[in-house]
Amino acid sequence: MADFSPHHSLLLKATAAGAAIATTNDPNISSFFLYNHSHGSQAPQPANAAAAAIVEDASLESSVSAVLDTSPSVDRKRKAAEDSAHSKDSCKDGKSRRGKKASKEVEEKSTTEDEPPKGYIHVRARRGQATDSHSLAERVRRERISERMRMLQALVPGCDKVTGKALILDEIINYVQSLQNQVEFLSMRIASMSPVLYGFGMDSDGLHDQKIGGMFQEALAMPNPVLNQSSPAPSQAIMDTTSTTSYSLQSQHGAISFSQDNGSYLMQAVGEPRQQEMLNQLVFNNMCSFQ
């Protein structure tokens, strides 16, 4: 222990530093430390300078390694940005393609809907109407019925202003009933005139064409003054015949004149006032009983 001088402590420190730096594999530094170890305390100051230089080299290496470590991160960021840009472009392309496909499909559907298939009658149905064959036949039948209704509506006076099939049918029924009543009234009036024919000595079968024609021929054989007789209060009756001339007859109680208009005979009975009053009363009673 007495052999060591105060400089031996520096040598020990130098040897320790040399052992620590030996891992750097620098031949110059190792030779320098070996030189210091061999010469002892002759150069302690250069050893401290070498240690400082080693520390600076280590800091430089650490900074270089840090720079080298940061460079891959920048590359990664660039790659990520490029990948995101590519992904956005691909998404846009995909959307555009999908939009084009959808537009093409819509156009194809519209063309197929506009063009009806061959061998099929295209009918645009209204609301509540079908397009099958049965429904088409039903539509045709209803159109024919509506045409007939319009014809009936034109025949009935005052029916053009009525709207609705039910109301139109009611108007037509009322009009037909009124016509039926008029026909019945006329038939009753003609039937009421048959006793008048009996009163003048005429047979009930005298309404036939042959007998009336014979009476007209007899009337033609009479002189003109008799044919021209007239009366201020005539009574009339209608009888259907086929003759086309006008005649005048004379009986015991007065004169009877016949005239024809479009296939119908008009009879005028000219006689005493009493018979005329009875005839008018009979016609009036028949009219009242009918009403």
Swiss-Prot record:
Cell compartments where the protein resides: Nucleus
InterPro entries: bHLH_dom, bHLH_ZIP_TF, HLH_DNA-bd_sf
Expression by tissue: Mostly expressed in panicles and stems and, at low levels, in leaves, lamina joints and roots.
Region named Disordered: 65-120
Basic and acidic residues bias (residue ranges): 80-117
Uses: Plants expressing BCL1 in the lamina joint and the spikelet under the control of BUL1 promoter exhibit increased leaf angle and grain length.
A Gene Ontology molecular function term of the record: protein dimerization activity
Assigned keywords, A-Z: Gibberellin signaling pathway, Nucleus, Transcription, Transcription regulation
Annotated region (Basic motif), positions in chain: 129-142
Region (Helix-loop-helix motif), start-end ranges: 143-179
Gene3D superfamilies reported for this sequence: Helix-loop-helix DNA-binding domain
Keyword check for Transcription: yes
Function, as annotated: Together with BCL2, positive regulator of cell elongation at least partially through increased gibberellic acid (GA) biosynthesis.
Protein name, UniProt field: Basic helix-loop-helix protein 80
Annotated organism of origin: Oryza sativa subsp. japonica
